[in-house]
Amino acid sequence: MKSLLIAACLLLPCGITCAQDPVPATTTSDVAVLEPFVASYEVFRGGKSLGEATMQVVSLPARRWRVDLMMRGTRGLFAMAGVNAEQSTVFDANGETYRPLTQATVNKTVFTQKKTIGVYDWRAGSATWQGDVKESRTGPLSLQGGDMSGLLINLAVIRDAEPGRTLQYRFVDNGRVRNHRYVVADEPESVSVAGIGYTAMRVDRIEQGNEETVIWVVKGVPTPIRMLQREDGMDTYDLRLIEYKGV
């Protein structure tokens, strides 16, 4: 099963730096305040419901935070196979900077379990991974200011999205480094998710090849209302918000 991207996206399965291009002047009052929340999603593939997902942000001691994304197969072959995937990133936040400290990924089925743990050592300026990861991806990888995991990039997109804006981030996650570029549509669009109508900003990740990632963002909602990943024009993962609440 693929890493959760919009990450990588999300999801799972997504930084250049934590700056945006172009970037209007930002004041302290413009920066969205990070707050804990729990959001529930239904997961679709090819238009068919496969399971459920939960994204949450948790406040920790010592001014640290944790963001989690958990997916569980509840229907069809995904349920029979016991598909269960989890990603977490512990991080600190200083204004507009979300700095990853540790990362964990667990993928489970009835017969298998794979786990990867990553450590972002900012004093040493490098990141390393251990567990069920290819030797070529264990690191160390050199860190740059603004580097983020895929889950943190999801939060950054929510924070930074404005109509017509271009967002650039450097993704450092699971032993890989990639530059991620997103473009926010000039005009908001009407979107219906789980029977609820929203006026949302469409954010497209600019990718090469046959992959496409789209995130829909609503002002005042701390999590994407929809996260869609496509390959060759076909939906591979589609997370649609059911509900969210502050904690």
Task: Locate the predicted segments by residue.
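N-terminal signal peptide c-region/cleavage motif recognized by signal peptidases
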Residues: 13-14
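Cleavable N-terminal signal peptides
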Residues: 6-7, 17
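Acidic, serine/threonine-rich low-complexity disordered tracts
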Residues: 21-122, 157-247
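Hydrophobic, well-structured mid-protein blocks that either form specific transmembrane helices
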Residues: 109-152
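Positively charged n-region of N-terminal signal peptides that target proteins for export
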Residues: 1-4
